[in-house]
Amino acid sequence: MLNKNTIFFGLLLFIPISLLGHWLHWDEVSIFLTASLAIIPLAAFMGEATEEIAIVVGPTLGGLLNATFGNATELILAFIALKSGLISVVKATITGSIISNLLLVMGFAMLLGGLRYKEQVFQSEVARVNASSMNLAVIAILLPTAVEHTSNGIGEETLQTLSVAVAIVLIIVYGLTLLFSMKTHSYLCEVGEIDQQSSSAMESGDKIPEKKPEDVNLWFWLGILLVVTITVAIESELLVNSLESATESLGLTALFTGVILLPVIGNAAEHFTAVTVAMKNKMDLSLSVAVGSTLQIALFVAPVLVIAGWIMGQPMDLDFNPFELVAVAVSVLIANSISSDGKSNWLEGSLLLATYIVIGLAFFFHPVVPEIG
């Protein structure tokens, strides 16, 4: 019988195929497609590994682990692009990652989880704290852009200095959010047992047995997670190296590619993990994956890239394309609005996905930006 695992194991064949295509110098579109297909099962196995580890370390650290390993590939690829001077593509990928996590990943999680359970609940207190943190992230990238567009003759060096200062503030805030969620207010996030009980009570038909921490081989799954993460990074690099020529052949702009296409592929790990746990009625863990990844991109990855660009002599700053900022602000607004009550259903997931589609269409028809393409 054909099931999900059979399909994923079959897709693993695209790992050697994509590597072979790279060594044999296949056309860029073929390499792009095979690398994309190779990432799908890897993301699924990464999600399974992180979920197993989360059983041992708890939903808060598990969510952080999901977000960290999901964004590790993006961070590595961003460093490569930054070193190559592709500043605008790096910025587009940052904003695109925020948009896709809040709308696409969280939307699918709420939709598919809501189709299985009439209503799902999560900690509204944590949702409000995350909403405030995301608002800060919007402010942090909005103000440097506003300074650039409302000032006459501000120098690139001054703008980068401002961006580095803001980046330091964001990293400090990110550390404070970790302290809040894992130390001083960890009780707000440790809700795995509540979710499991509600899952057993609400689920009809076949029931998924809940594993206990002592049933999980932690070191085995850590090894799996390490191997899969390294392979994801290799495949993602193949994908990005072929991306420019492939998207040009497909008639896509670099702006659409950076904001929509790259984050969708790069966030495949978060997507699979968030949806999988949402379908098991673990919405707190699901949202900690999606929102936690968003906060890490905004409060950690972006600031680190700004500081790295400053060290490497690359003009990486927080002056973003105004249209990208509008899309980020809209995404944060609707995500905060939907998650504020601590409840979700399939319709709210549909609204998030509809917003993502509208934003995607806007970027698809957006005219070429000279410095991006």
From Swiss-Prot:
Note the InterPro entries from the entry: CaH_exchang, CAX-like, NaCa_Exmemb, NCX_ion-bd_dom_sf
Superkingdom to which the source organism belongs: Bacteria
Q: Does the keyword Ribonucleoprotein apply?
A: no
Instruction: Tell me a GO biological process for this protein.
Output: calcium ion transmembrane transport
Residues crossing the lipid bilayer are: 6-26, 29-49, 61-81, 94-114, 134-154, 162-182, 220-240, 249-269, 291-311, 318-338, 349-369
Broad class of where this protein is predominantly found: membrane
Tell me the compartments it is located in. Answer: Cell inner membrane
Instruction: Identify its membrane topology class.
Output: Multi-pass membrane protein
GO terms for MF? calcium:proton antiporter activity
Q: One of this protein's Pfam families, by short name?
A: Na_Ca_ex
Tagged with keyword Transmembrane helix: yes
**Entry GO terms, CC:** plasma membrane
The protein's pH behavior is summarized as:
Optimum pH is 8.8.
Q: Which UniProt keywords apply?
A: Antiport, Calcium, Calcium transport, Cell inner membrane, Cell membrane, Ion transport, Membrane, Transmembrane, Transmembrane helix, Transport
Q: What is the similarity comment for this entry?
A: Belongs to the Ca(2+):cation antiporter (CaCA) (TC 2.A.19) family. Cation/proton exchanger (CAX) subfamily.
The record's function comment reads: Ca(+)/H(+) antiporter that extrudes calcium in exchange for external protons. Plays an important role in salt tolerance. Does not transport sodium or lithium.
Family matches, as NCBIfam families: caca2, cax
Instruction: Return the protein name.
Output: Ca(2+)/H(+) antiporter
Q: Which organism is it from?
A: Aphanothece halophytica
Q: What is the lineage of its organism?
A: Bacteria, Bacillati, Cyanobacteriota, Cyanophyceae, Oscillatoriophycideae
